[in-house]
């Protein structure tokens, strides 16, 4: 039986990164019916909560996000726990690990990317 879920892909910028990750995860469940709703340019947890509360989703919901501002992430985590909505902090966890390794605080500025021509090194191990 096909189960319907809604995933809110939330971003403080365009939502492109988080939407791609949600689509990649969704592809692993071909029998599931996943609706992805992208929320862009989010600045507060209240914006997300208000949007979710105004929806009438037919099944379970989850929030995947790439919010950079630590305070907003914390507020969002608390609000979603109260609402019993599972969430995945995709960018905050990555920034935390890098901050520890670099012994530096992240800027928490939405939209920053490295455009210096540096490309990652790819290795095909197959």
Give short role names for the model-derived ranges.
Residues 1, 32-33, 73, 77-87:
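Non-catalytic terminal and connector segments of soluble metabolic enzymes
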Residues 1-21, 25:
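N-terminal accessory targeting/assembly segments
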Residues 3-6, 32-34, 56-61:
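Short, surface-exposed connector motifs at secondary-structure boundaries
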Residues 10-13, 65-70, 92:
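Structural motif
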Residues 24-33:
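Short helix-loop-beta junction
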Residues 36-39, 87-89:
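Conserved beta-strand scaffold positions in the cores of enzyme catalytic domains, especially
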Residues 37-67, 71-81:
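Metallocofactor- and cofactor-centric catalytic cores in central/energy metabolism, strongly enriched
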Residues 81-126:
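Ser/Thr/Gly-rich flexible loops in soluble cytosolic domains mediating phosphotransfer, phosphorylation
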